[in-house]
Amino acid sequence: MPEPHAPWNEVVPGLWMGGHHWTDASGERRPVIVGTEFGLVISLYTRPGHGPDPSVDHLVAEIPDGPLVAAQIHSVQQLAHTAARSVKEGRTVLVRCNAGYNRSGLVIAQTLIELGHEAPTAIHTVRQRRSPSALNNRLFEEYLNAGLGVAHLLADLETLS
C-alpha cells in the first residue's frame, strides 16, 4: 500500500484526516508532527514525538485495524460525535491513525454520517479526499454500511456467546 502523499488532507471544511508518516515529492518518508494547526486532534494510534502541542485538545482511543469489540465501536461512535460537534462549532479537527487510511477513515466516515451524509457517500468522500487506499479494511466499510449502532449490537452479542 502506498504511503500518503500529504501529512493530512481536508475531507470537508474543518475536518482533516492524517497519519503519522507521509512521503514527499522526492519519495522520502517523513514523520507527521502536529503542532497547533488544529483545535482538536483525535488519535487512534500514538507515537511519542508526533504531537500535538500540549495546548491542543487531544483525545486518544487506540483501536486495532481489525475486528472491533463493542466497546471499541462505541468509542468510534463517541469520537465521531465529538468531531462532528466540533466541526459544527467551527473548530478544525484532525483524526489520525498510523497510516491515515483505515482507523481514521472509519471515524471520519462516521463523522460525515453524523453531519448528514449517507454511508456510501461518506466512504466515497474519504477515498476521494485522502486516498483510494483509504478504508481498504472491508470490515470497517461493512460496519459503516450496516450502521455503527447495528455493528455495536452485533459485536456485543458475540461477547455473550
Which residues does each predicted region cover?
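Short linear sequence elements within intrinsically disordered, low-complexity coil regions
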Residues: 106, 145-148
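C-terminal domain-closing interface element
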Residues: 149-161
